[in-house]
């Protein structure tokens, strides 16, 4: 099985989209629309089950709903090729089913050990959990593409489930992407502090916006 490399600086490959080769500007619009569909999917899930668990089926379903209009051949399916991203090789594709299952179980176990919301360290512990979650998900790289976007949408699901507001980790500008990728690369070295800082800043901003309503 051949190895595929994602583009440098986190750019998404779009050569095999359902629309053929399209300008980056058009792809961005499709990605934004896909993310909106994904967030609506999450809202619908939580409206039926407030404590919706992170599971392989949920992850695959979210990816399919969000990106099948762009890449219908493999949206919602675990990758079946070997890929490299950000200068490193992703785990072997034939290990993905087990890795994703263990990741979901680990996530739920960590959520179950969070302190009560009235505890002083609740938000700090949530931020640490989300930083671990995002980094681990992208490291596993379950999909051929859109792993980062899927991780960020799942982060919102966890926040809403915990009674916290959604956050937006900006990634559209070059500066935003550089900050996020630097934080993720630090995580590769076992240091999640930069990613925790980005998540903490975004969560603080969301909480402040609620107070100002």
Segments and roles (model prediction):
Residues 1-145, 149-213:
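FIC/Doc superfamily catalytic core
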């Amino acid at each position: 099985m051949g190895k595929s490399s994602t583009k440098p600086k986190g750019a998404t490959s779009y050569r095999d989209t359902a629309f053929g080769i399209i300008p980056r500007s058009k792809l961005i619009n499709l990605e934004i629309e896909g993310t909106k569909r994904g967030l609506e999917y999450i809202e619908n899930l939580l409206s039926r089950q407030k404590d919706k668990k992170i599971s392989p089926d949920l992850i695959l379903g979210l990816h399919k709903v969000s990106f099948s209009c762009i890449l219908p051949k493999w949206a919602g399916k675990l990758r079946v090729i070997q890929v490299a991203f950000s200068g490193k090789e992703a785990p072997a594709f034939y290990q993905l089913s087990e890795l994703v299952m263990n990741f979901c179980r680990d996530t739920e176990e960590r959520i179950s050990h969070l302190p009560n919301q009235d505890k002083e360290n609740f938000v700090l512990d949530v931020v640490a959990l989300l930083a671990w979650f995002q980094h681990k998900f992208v490291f596993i790289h379950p999909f051929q593409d859109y792993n980062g976007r899927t991780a960020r949408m799942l982060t919102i699901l966890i926040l809403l489930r915990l009674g916290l507001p959604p956050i937006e980790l900006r990634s559209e500008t070059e500066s935003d992407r550089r900050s996020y990728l630097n934080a993720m690369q630090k995580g590769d070295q076992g240091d999640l502090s930069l990613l925790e800082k980005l998540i903490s800043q975004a969560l603080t901003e969301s909480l402040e916006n609620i107070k100002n309503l």
